[in-house]
């Protein structure tokens, strides 16, 4: 059940970040991660860059690690997904990526939840891409 929710969060976060949809991101991220995402979105906007993304799907996902501290629980998940992405400048010139090429992406995301929380929600706290 956790893994299914993590997959939904993964797709939502990737799509929301590409669109610059800060309202959809906030409930899925820790405060620190939210600050990082907000900063990246502001930076992209200040440079008049547009991110285009088509999420093809998740090829696989697996829990790689479970950790617990006195205060929180952590799940580390490896996602292998396929996306089409590019960045364009204000004149619609492609400056990064390829709008016609499917790319395989491998991400390792860590989710956390406070032990004392009454909420069943998990929050993205760390991202590693390869």
Identify the residue ranges that each predicted region occupies.
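Core segments of small alpha/beta cavity-forming domains
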Residues: 1-64
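Short, solvent-exposed beta-strand/turn "edge" segments of beta-rich domains on protein surfaces
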Residues: 1-3, 68, 98
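Extended aliphatic helical segments
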Residues: 13, 22, 77-80, 105
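Residue-level marker of positions within ordered structural domains that often coincide
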Residues: 30, 82, 116
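Surface-exposed, charged secondary-structure patches
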Residues: 49-89
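Short beta-strand edge/turn micro-motifs at domain boundaries
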Residues: 72-76, 85-130
